[in-house]
């Protein structure tokens, strides 16, 4: 890595592929399991759901995949924190003055995170997901990145491409939604704290 330039958030270029690791809503789901377990039970989730969700907290480091993306030639990368993967994608597009075309159906989501999203009624796209890393990768670097991630045992998905048309367009089963604001209107974890009472309150 000596002499290699750091990979910034703003380097995505038209034609790059957008890759993400692990899944959406990781940390937010784990936090809800730790801090709102009684609410989770009341909403119909089971003990095994809560225990499984807590284990997601073990995945919050992105160092292994960040090393791989950096070594293999990614043009940009961004960890998914407050505001979820939607805010991450919007920031990457805005900073690079490009657009992103994303397929929601290609985004991995742990089954337990999906169960929590349904029970707590939150949008997994806007839920904090530390442990998830998003990167833009040129076509000619793609196979090397994928091979290295596979060898490291890191779950990944190719979720879309960088375009010259500005804005983030996400394809859902119901159609395509275009997002143009830099920041989504709300953070889902913060909304959960206003809607539900934590266990120690």
Each model region followed by its residue ranges:
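Glycine-rich anion-binding loops of enzyme active sites
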Residues: 1-39, 161, 173
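A generic local secondary-structure boundary/capping motif
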Residues: 3-11, 21, 66, 90, ...
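Solvent-exposed alpha-helices and their adjacent loops that cap or buttress functional pockets
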Residues: 9-13, 43-45, 67-71, 94, ...
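Active-site-proximal betaalpha loop/short-helix elements
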Residues: 53-129
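Beta-strand->loop->alpha-helix junctions that form or flank phosphate-binding loops
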Residues: 80-81, 99-108, 126-128, 146-173
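Helix N-cap motif at beta-to-alpha junctions
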Residues: 136-143
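Acidic, Ser/Thr/Pro-rich beta/coil linker or hinge segments at domain junctions
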Residues: 152-201
């Amino acid at each position: 890595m000596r002499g290699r330039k750091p990979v910034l958030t703003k380097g995505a270029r038209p034609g790059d592929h957008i890759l993400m690791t692990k899944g959406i809503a990781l940390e937010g789901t784990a936090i809800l399991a730790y801090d709102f377990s009684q609410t989770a039970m009341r909403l119909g989730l089971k003990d095994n759901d809560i225990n499984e969700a807590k284990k997601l907290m073990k995945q919050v480091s992105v160092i292994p995949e960040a090393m791989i993306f950096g070594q293999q030639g990614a043009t940009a990368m961004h960890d998914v924190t407050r505001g979820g993967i939607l805010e991450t994608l919007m920031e990457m597009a805005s900073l690079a003055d490009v657009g992103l075309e994303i397929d929601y159906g290609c985004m991995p989501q742990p089954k337990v995170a999906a169960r929590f999203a349904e029970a707590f009624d939150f949008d997994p796209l806007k839920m904090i997901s530390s442990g998830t890393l998003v990167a833009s990768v040129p076509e000619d670097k793609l196979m090397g990145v994928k091979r290295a991630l596979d060898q490291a045992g890191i779950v990944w998905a190719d979720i879309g491409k960088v375009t010259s048309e500005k804005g983030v367009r996400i394809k859902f089963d119901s159609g395509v939604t275009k997002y143009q604001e830099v920041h989504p209107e709300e953070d889902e974890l913060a909304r959960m704290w206003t809607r539900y009472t934590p266990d120690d309150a």
